[in-house]
């Protein structure tokens, strides 16, 4: 998978946090899902490739 500035929807019907879901979680995707229901990883973006400071992801990859 890519390691760059995602437009929001990385997977079909899934979002990696901020853009698609303001709460900062991705539904059924894993990255920052139920472990961060209100943007637990706010200011972090770990997509399995590296930490990004401009995303609301969980600071760790769940899947």
UniProtKB/Swiss-Prot annotation:
Signal peptide (residue range): none
Entry comment describing in which tissues the protein is expressed: Is essentially restricted to only one vertical half of the hair forming compartment and in beard hairs is absent from the central medulla.
Superkingdom in the source lineage: Eukaryota
A matching Pfam family: KRTAP
Keyword Repeat set for record: yes
Keyword Repeat carried by entry: yes
Chain positions covered by the region annotation 12 X 2 AA repeats of G-[YCGS]: 12-54
InterPro entries associated with the record: KRTAP8-1, KRTAP_type8/19/20/21/22
Keyword entries, A-Z: Keratin, Repeat
Similarity comment: Belongs to the KRTAP type 8 family.
Known role: In the hair cortex, hair keratin intermediate filaments are embedded in an interfilamentous matrix, consisting of hair keratin-associated proteins (KRTAP), which are essential for the formation of a rigid and resistant hair shaft through their extensive disulfide bond cross-linking with abundant cysteine residues of hair keratins. The matrix proteins include the high-sulfur and high-glycine-tyrosine keratins.
Protein name in the entry: Keratin-associated protein 8-1
Protein's organism: Homo sapiens
Gene for this chain: KRTAP8-1
């Amino acid at each position: 998978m890519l390691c760059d500035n995602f437009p929001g929807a990385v997977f079909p019907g899934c979002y990696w946090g901020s853009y698609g879901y303001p709460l900062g979680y991705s539904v059924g995707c894993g990255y920052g899902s139920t472990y961060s229901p209100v943007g637990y990883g706010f200011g972090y973006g770990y997509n399995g490739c590296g930490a990004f400071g401009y995303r609301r992801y969980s600071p760790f990859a769940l899947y």
